[in-house]
Amino acid sequence: MEYGLIGAKLGHSYSKIIHEMLCGYKYDLCPLPTEEEARAFLTKRQFRAINVTIPYKKLVMEYCSYIDPRAKAIGAVNTVVNKNGLLYGYNTDYLGFAHLCDAHGVDFAGRTVLILGTGGTHNTTSAVARDKGAAKVLTVSRHPDPETGELSYAEAVRSGAQIVINTTPAGMYPNVGVCNLDVAAMPGLEAVVDVVYNPDKTELILRAEEAGVPVAVGGLEMLVAQAVYAAEYFLDRKFEDAPAEIRRITAALRRDTLNIALIGMPSSGKTTLGKLLAKQLGRTFVDLDDAIVKADGRSIPDIFAAEGEDGFRAKETEQTARFGKENRQLLSCGGGVVKRPENLRALHQNGVVLFIDRPVEALAVGGSRPLSSSMAALRTMEAQRRPLYRAAADAVVPNTGTLEDALRAAMEALDEIFDS
């Protein structure tokens, strides 16, 4: 192996995609489940340069002949370069986190900062916060140690902090939807930063957005940035414009991996348009109504007849949560998916949402749709749901002409979203 990543579990890593997109060299994922395997790998030194992830960022320091002062102070190495058999260790997580905060205007000067978690990434983010002038850095733990001044999550809410940084795995794929801090009860917050990058927006970030926190950002750009700075060490050269490379690759990753969810009234064209979009964009097409029927074994009219709308909505929420946390899908949603806030969080956590807007006069009446029994019912429904569709959507796609027109409008909307 020339270049690659070592760690205990690498199943969901984006590092291979990032490095090969960045520099074109072959980048291998090398899972080493045990410490014994990691030590054997490092002893052999059969690589040019590697990245290191949990749980080996401290262990690798034992094998380094040189450790960058910043990495030594943090107590973790995530980038190792083999120079004629001698290993040189660096910490580009620091650089990646600093870039993320700078790029999104997080101002640490004079601020009180809460860091959720006590693991290795705590030290990295704490170093950045202190170096950028934070007045106070507080640590939050589920099991706080009073002797070290750690806070509980309940105490953290009352801390008066302006900045929150999550370094725990709370909300990380596949265990999404977890949020341990009540950010809505912290009115003075200026920024919430989560180092988790899958999903794109954790529950913490989604709730921060809902609470109106000015800056709420996940960790994907940090991941890309640390890879760019690691590649500079790998190749012993600087990129002419590293921030531009980081923006380019972050946008490309989102374009490649994020789900696209279509919302709108029944018979507005979500399924037909969705299948065309899925084919054009290389996404797996999923009709959530079909997923409900497949999981339940009954038709939608039969579910409504037996359990009413509430019973159907509960099943809809289950399937939205199931598919919403995955990647590279085109989700055609039922017309009422916007009625539950938890559904919108599930769609936004790893995707962009398009409202397919078709005039109510052009919608189909009756058929297998229990709530679309007449044009009068459709008009009432449309009046109730239109504000919800608009509030939930990242963009509106008019479907008033040909299918080709709608497809073109959808692609233009996606280009604008991913390029912004």
Which ranges hold each PLM region?
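NTP-dependent small-molecule kinase module
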Residues: 244-256, 276, 280, 326, ...
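Phosphate/diphosphate ligand-binding glycine-rich loop within oxidoreductases
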Residues: 2-104, 199-201, 205-207, 211-217, ...
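ATP-dependent small-molecule kinase phosphotransfer cores
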Residues: 290-348
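Rossmann-like adenosine-cofactor binding region
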Residues: 148-216, 337-343
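A glycine- and Lys/Arg-enriched "phosphate-lid" helix/loop adjacent to the NTP-binding pocket
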Residues: 349-388, 395
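Adenosine-phosphate binding glycine-rich loop
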Residues: 31, 195-258, 399
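Glycine-rich adenosine-cofactor-binding loop
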Residues: 7, 89-94, 101-102, 106, ...
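NAD(P)-binding Rossmann-fold cofactor-contacting core
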Residues: 131-149, 289-291, 295-296
